[in-house]
Amino acid sequence: TRADQVMQALIDYEDTRQVLAHGQTKSSVVLKNALQVDLRFVDQDSFGAALHYFTGSKAHNIAVRRLALDRDLKVNEYGIFQGEKKVAGKSEEDVYASVGLPYIEPELREDRGELEAAVKGELPWLIQKEDLCGDLHVHTKDSDGKNTFQELAKAAEDMGYEYLGIT
C-alpha cells in the first residue's frame, strides 16, 4: 500500500539514525540531528480526530475528553464515540462540535482557559500572515543566508512588507 511505502521511506531515509517503532499505521524515528519524527496513518474519517489529538497539549486533550464524558462520549485519535459507534472525527470542527464547542485553533490548545473562552465566544484573535508588516531578522548570502540582499528586498516588497531587517 501507499502507507507501507511511505513508512518504509521514513525508515530507509538516509538521515534516520534510530528506529523507535515501525508498523502499519505508526512509525517513529530519531534523525541524525536528534529530531524525533512520528508518522501516523489514519482513515480519512478519523483525520480530524487524529489532527486534534496530536496538535493539542496533553492537558488540552484531557480537558476535551472530560467534556466528552459529560455527554457520554469518548474522544481519542480515532474519533468521537458513543459506546462503540463512531459519531464524529472527520474534521477537527466535528471534534469540538461534539463536545459543544466552536473550533479552537491549534496555537491555543494548552488548557489555559481556551475551553472556557470558547464557551463564552471569547477566543482571542490570532495574528495572520497578512497582519505582518515586515521581518526584523533575515540573513543574506553574505552570512549564512541563501539569498542576496536584492533578492530579499524584492521578496519583502512582493509580500507588501514595510520594512526588512538584515542581521
Model-found features: residue ranges?
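Acidic, metal-coordinating catalytic segment for phosphate/diphosphate chemistry
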Residues: 4-130
